[in-house]
Regions:
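Beta1/beta-strand and adjacent pyrophosphate-binding region of the FAD-binding site
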Residues: 1-12
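Glycine-rich FAD pyrophosphate-binding loop
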Residues: 5, 21-54
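Short hydrophobic core segments
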Residues: 5-7, 38, 182, 204-217, ...
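An anion/pyrophosphate-binding glycine-rich loop and adjacent beta-alpha core
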Residues: 42-43, 50, 59, 63, ...
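Glycine-rich active-site loop/strand segments that organize a redox cofactor
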Residues: 53-92, 124-148
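A glycine-rich dinucleotide-binding beta-alpha-beta segment and adjacent secondary-structure elements
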Residues: 178, 350-427
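A conserved short coil-to-beta-strand element within the FAD-binding core of flavoproteins
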Residues: 178-193
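A conserved FAD-binding loop/helix module that cradles the flavin
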Residues: 425-454
């Protein structure tokens, strides 16, 4: 009996195991192969899923665009390949077939009144979204769509996503071995036979087909040198450390703003949203997204009034100075702290004044107004690096995508080896994109591994 090993019981690994089992059943080969999922956690699979989306699990996005991903062309090719496997046309129509095998009726429910309505059917989903939506619809998950296309389970708890995955895993035919952290993988002799899997507890396993879904941090701990090149990973999608002389004065204060990332005077990227000041730097979704591109020495420019042009901001401050001076009986004289009162928190106003070289308690001159306006539109912080690696949601690096075929997720020069999820050098911004990639690549790798195990030549070509 051939063995298919799934390494890692996170999002990608669970999707791969379920898809492998489903495809073997569809091919009438469930009795010919053994599926074993090796999970590093000593007790359970999917623990990492419970922490996503602040415990709510932003499991996908309703507007998936491959351009949002690192290594865009590879991701687009993989998503299109998965769509073809699941019977999705270019416009998301047609009934699902193959490993997904279920209708998509009633897959989503409307959200609350403050949210955009969720999809009532996956028929309206695009070629990039439909396969994942159909997969979860088949498992019985109900969801809703919130702002910016973020998709959450209707139960509003990450555990509901894990519950349907674990139920599907139970009937997939996969056997789970816990406490198995992979330390090395060795290729079959002369390219034929079984892969040798070495684990940190000293045990060894063998498998004809292997799906590596160990995550970004996990892949760095695996010696893959005999089968595939692997780049060291570094944490991204997290807070940034900056010059803390400014940020420590604003620790734990949140502001709505726009943040631009600049390098050598040129714009690298820009994000709008909520920013959280920390004693070591800055955090928040907009910062997390910029961290994917940030390098030490770059500059973050924070615009506290992003919907005003520089001229409008100047005019606003002059008009505010004039109005409040008359209102407060200042005879044309009013301090900066009075002008900013009601528009910004006092701590923020104090820091902005200090950065503009203004005494917040002294009358605000015309020159001071212009200086303050410039700082409000561009408080500058120098990036020192990642602020807290433990908060980072993904890793940059891992297995080189050049070594894999996006049509199958199979290794080009190591037949029988597949990879999925964050183990590959693919990452995306916040909003459900990274989990969407985990499910998608896991499903594609699982189907391909099953077909490879069953096919006469073992190459796993699509039917």
């Amino acid at each position: 009996m051939k063995k298919i090993a799934i390494i890692g019981g996170g999002a990608a690994g669970l999707a791969a195991a379920i898809a492998t089992g489903n495809e073997l059943v569809r091919l009438g080969a469930a009795d010919e192969c053994e599926i074993v999922l090796f999970e590093a956690d000593p007790e359970r699979v999917g623990r990492s899923i419970l922490a996503t989306g602040n415990g709510r699990c932003n499991f996908s996005n309703a507007h998936i665009d491959p351009a949002c991903y690192r290594n865009t062309d590879f991701v687009e090719a993989a998503l299109r390949s998965l769509a073809r496997l699941s019977g999705v046309s270019e416009w998301g129509s047609a009934q699902p077939v193959g490993a997904y095998g279920a209708s998509a009726q009633g897959s989503a429910q409307p959200a609350g009144t403050s949210e955009a309505p969720g999809r009532e059917s996956t028929q309206s989903a695009s070629v990039f979204e439909a396969p994942v939506q159909r997969f979860f619809s088949d498992l019985g998950l109900m969801w809703r769509e919130e702002g910016e296309g973020r998709m959450y389970p209707a139960a509003n708890k990450a555990s509901s996503v894990l519950d349907v995955l674990r139920a599907a895993l139970d009937v997939s035919g996969a056997r789970v071995e816990f406490g198995k952290a992979l330390s090395a993988i060795e290729a079959p002799a002369r390219g034929k036979g079984r892969f040798h899997l070495r684990f940190s507890d000293g045990s060894i396993a063998h498998a004809e087909k292997v799906v590596l879904a160990v995550g970004g941090r996990g892949v760095s701990a695996v010696d893959t040198s005999s089968v595939i090149p692997c780049e060291l990973t570094r944490p991204v999608l997290g807070p940034l450390a900056t010059d803390s002389r400014i940020t420590r004065q604003l620790n734990n204060i949140r502001v709505k703003c726009a943040v631009s990332l600049e390098r050598s005077g040129s714009l690298v990227a820009r994000e709008e949203g909520e920013l959280l000041f920390r004693d070591y730097g800055v955090s928040g979704v907009c910062v997390f997204n910029l961290s994917r591109f940030a390098c030490e020495g770059d500059v973050l420019s924070i615009d506290f009034l992003p919907h005003m042009s520089a001229a409008d901001r100047d005019a606003w401050l002059f008009a505010r100075r004039k109005h409040l001076s008359a209102r407060l009986g200042g005879n044309g004289q009013i301090a900066a702290e009075d002008v900013l009162r009601g528009a910004m928190l006092p701590q923020v106003a104090q820091v902005l004044c200090k950065c503009a070289g203004i005494d917040p308690a002294r009358p605000l001159s015309k020159k001071d107004v212009l200086a303050l306006s410039r700082v409000i539109g561009g408080l500058r912080l120098t990036v020192r690096g990642i602020g807290d690696a433990k908060q980072c949601q993904v890793s940059r690096g891992g297995l080189s995508i050049a070594a894999f075929d996006p049509q199958t997720m199979g290794a080009v020069r190591a037949s029988g080896l597949f990879a999925a999820g964050e183990a590959l050098d693919v990452d995306a911004p916040c909003g459900g994109y990274n989990l969407h990639w985990a499910w998608s690549s896991g499903l594609l790798a699982g189907v391909s591994a099953a077909r490879s195990a069953v096919s006469a030549d073992g190459e796993g070509e699509g039917e």
